[in-house]
Structure formats: structure tokens, C-alpha cells
Amino acid sequence: MKGLIVDEPWISKILRGEKHWEMRSQATAVRGLVALIRKGSGKIVGVARVTGCRGPLSLDELRANKDRHCVSMDEFESGRAMKWTTAWELIGAQSLPTPVPYKHP
């Protein structure tokens, strides 16, 4: 199974079902179930299904979909987040009852 390393607060938002697009700098060909790894923890804390990618997205598209990616538009408009304009679409995120140790290959 592939893994996706995600920083806070984004991974918690994904696991709570609040965030459905994980913003990245590039598209992925990966589809299906992926492990969700909390950045810096060395733990798999959940799973989600990658169903597709969109982008690179324009500022207007990012603005129209803020409820899906949950990133402040100030981050994009200031240029701080402009490298993250490709959305990885996630569905069915679930927390694991007990986090599983993960070692990066």
C-alpha cells in the first residue's frame, strides 16, 4: 500500500471528513487505498481512497473550492502556497483505532 505523508492541521481535517482535497505540487497516478501518515510521527494514523487529481488550479478555481481544500486563500494570494495547486481527491478517510509504526523506505 502506498502512503501519503500529511502535516497538521491538514491530516486531522482529512480524518474528520472536513478536507477532501489534499493540495500538492504535482498530480499522482496512484488510485485506491492509501495509508495516511502524520508528518513527523512515524505513524500511519488512517486510510483514505485517492480517486483522482485536478489541476493545476487557478486562483479562481481554488477560491471556488476552498471548502474542499481548507487552505486559506491568503496563503495562495500571497504566493506562499502557490506551489500546491494540484488537488489529490480523497474519499472515505478513516482513522485507525491504534496508529501503526511506519518507516520511510
Predicted feature locations:
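Structured alpha/beta reader/binder surfaces that contact nucleic acids or chromatin modification marks
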Residues: M1-P105
